[in-house]
Amino acid sequence: MARTSSSFGFMGRFGRSHDLRELDKALRAADLHPMLVPEGVKLATVNLMKDAEGGEPPDHAYPYVADMLAFCALGANGFAGANGIERLEAVEARLTEAVETGDGLDAQLVLLALHAKLLHPGIIEEYGISAEEQ
């Protein structure tokens, strides 16, 4: 199946692609304003999602990804304050697994957030996250 291209839009004339609109909506729902996330990070995120899904991700996949990005950017306290303890515990478990395995969509999202300087200092310290060349 051919992968569709994502689009930022152009001068208000051509609209943003569906995947970027869905990611923006999911980021807002996770209490991370989309304007705080660079467009390049959002584009890379939807491309990582497409790679993981083997095609277009379903709409229900965006909140899952947005929770990880919001947790990375807001830190544990900020995320919990906006999203509750249950969602905090779920995303913390996902981050722990991503750090331990170093593989998968969550690990790629954390690495993307680290390189984009979106990773909260408390998260870096608590989980010992760093990017090392091999």
Q: What residue ranges belong to the model's regions?
A:
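Amphipathic alpha-helical interaction modules
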Residues: 34-95
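Intrinsically disordered, low-complexity segments used for protein-protein interactions
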Residues: 12-13, 25, 125, 129
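Amphipathic alpha-helical binding modules
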Residues: 89-134
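Charged, amphipathic alpha-helical linkers/stalks
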Residues: 19-31
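Alpha-helical protein-protein interaction elements
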Residues: 3-6, 56, 63, 119
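Compositionally biased, low-complexity repeat tracts
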Residues: 5-8, 74, 80, 98, ...
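Short acidic, low-complexity intrinsically disordered linear motifs used
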Residues: 1-21
